[in-house]
Each structure stands twice: as C-alpha cells, then as structure tokens.
C-alpha cells in the first residue's frame, strides 16, 4: 500500500492556520488591520495572559453585513478583492481571505457585529472552527471580537509559544507600530485589566509618541519633513541624548 494520503479538511485547515497565525501577536495584527479596513476611528485592544487566554478587539467601523456573516470564517472569502486584477489597485491591508478562517481553526471565538445597513446585529460563538451559537442581537455599529484559548487544539503549537511576558512584548510592539502608523485612529491598549496607553486619534504623531513613550521622550523629538515630486517624508527623530543600543526603536511606515 502506498504511503501518500489525502489529508482531511480539518487537518488541512489547522496546518494552513499555522502559516498565518503563529503567535498571539499575529492575531492582534490581523484583527486590528480588519478594523482599520473597516474605517474605524476607535479601536480597543485587550489581552490577557500574553494573549493566550484572551485577545479582544472592539471597533466602531462599518461592521459586517448580516448576509456576509456565513462567509466570514470561510477560507479565501474576502470583501477586499473580486479577481486577480484587483491586486494591482488594492488599498486595504487585508485581501487574502485567510485571517479569520485561520484564527477560527485554532481558537474559540465570540463575535458581535452590526453594519449601518442592518437593523439588528449578529452574535456568533465558534469552537474549533465550528459555529455553536448564532443569533440576532441589538448592538452598536461596529465589531467586537474575542479570541480565546489560542492553540488549545494544537498542543505542539501551544508548546512552542514563549512565556506570557515574551508574547506580550510581541503584542505590544505590534499595537505600538499600528498606533504610530494610524494617528487618525484612537487606539486604547489594555493588558490584564490595566490601560497601557490610549492615543487621541487627532492625527498628531507627536501626541501618539507621548502616549506610548512618555512626555520626557516626546520632548526630545525633532520633526523631520521632506518632499519632492516622487515622495514625502514626515516623522520624528530623537536628539543624541536619547539613544538605544539597538535599532528596535527605529520605526518606518510606508504609504501609511
């Protein structure tokens, strides 16, 4: 008998999910980018136990239309593109249609969402990729998604995660970079019930720098402005007395 077999759909989904979602920070990135693509002006990110037990993202974006809900957790289902030609003019952060299905395959999910075109919102609860609850609810326009028990059904992947403290470092780095690149969005970051920072969402980069790094650091920043017919550069660079032994605090955002 031959040795090559066709894998079942459940195994395929879990393997594929590991390529997209490799740690809690990946979940945070994908969910925040979904909120940004939904034109949210306010995003709240909450994590517990390094994101292993809970990752919650709340936004006031356009929400998910009720008729789109059945496709939300299907692989390669997306509202961002319709054909290969759209890749040449894509303006969204997400487009592959893999993030939500990948997250659902390796975690428990609670989702509440309402679009401005629907009278009622929808609540969905999922366990290991399967919907166990779905009902209509009254809620605000936008989306609330809670990802719980990440990798509970893939012990090998869970084993290779670092300590809660280390995973939290990756998450914090992700949230900070997204906040710095999206100064027009108010972003609140909560860790284990404590607010770490909240940006004003007023479009002022220096205000975001102050929220994340503190007023002392903000006062040591110098503005950088340059533009020509091809590009424009806007940002801040620190004075010499504020220096680090590595390049981790050098952050670039292209077409942000």
Regions found by a protein language model. Name each.
Residues 1-256:
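N-terminal phosphate-binding caps/lids of nucleotide- and nucleic-acid-binding domains
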